[in-house]
């Protein structure tokens, strides 16, 4: 059942047109990350960013995030694209933005980072594991520490928190409510319900 993607039908002056729900949202410049972030998801998100920039480089793009996180390099590819393209990228957390999901949430355009009231946000240090020869393990250990420093530096930049605070807080899983994430600087506003 999880593989089913709803189809929506739109009436136009030329007749009916059917879209899968994600294509319909893309028409409104909405991109959705709804699960773990891996290379496949990153490539899809990046392609959508580049397409929307080509369509209209002046109009905001809205990135909705409900993700437990994922592969650091895949998330950094999305991050780099968000920073590279001309349109402002607003980020909206619904459900959860954990690990790389919270990193992308914080990387939205200043003043345009949101979470719904019941959202949960979690930051922590990158996870990794490797096996093999001692030299290879040492190489990978140095790389994950370099990634940890890079992610902490970027989080400090986007949140306004001192690097020392970020380093302390990411030593272990650090969960926040939407309001706590706002105070921390991960988001700018908690979005009220529309009704």
Swiss-Prot record:
Subcellular location as annotated: Cytoplasm
Catalytic residues as annotated in Swiss-Prot or TrEMBL: 99, 124
The reaction(s) this protein catalyses: Hydrolysis of proteins to small peptides in the presence of ATP and magnesium. alpha-casein is the usual test substrate. In the absence of ATP, only oligopeptides shorter than five residues are hydrolyzed (such as succinyl-Leu-Tyr-|-NHMec, and Leu-Tyr-Leu-|-Tyr-Trp, in which cleavage of the -Tyr-|-Leu- and -Tyr-|-Trp bonds also occurs)
Enzyme class: hydrolase
Gene Ontology annotations for the cellular component aspect, listed alphabetically: cytoplasm; endopeptidase Clp complex
Family assignment from sequence similarity: Belongs to the peptidase S14 family.
Protein name as catalogued: ATP-dependent Clp protease proteolytic subunit
Species: Desulforamulus reducens (strain ATCC BAA-1160 / DSM 100696 / MI-1) (Desulfotomaculum reducens)
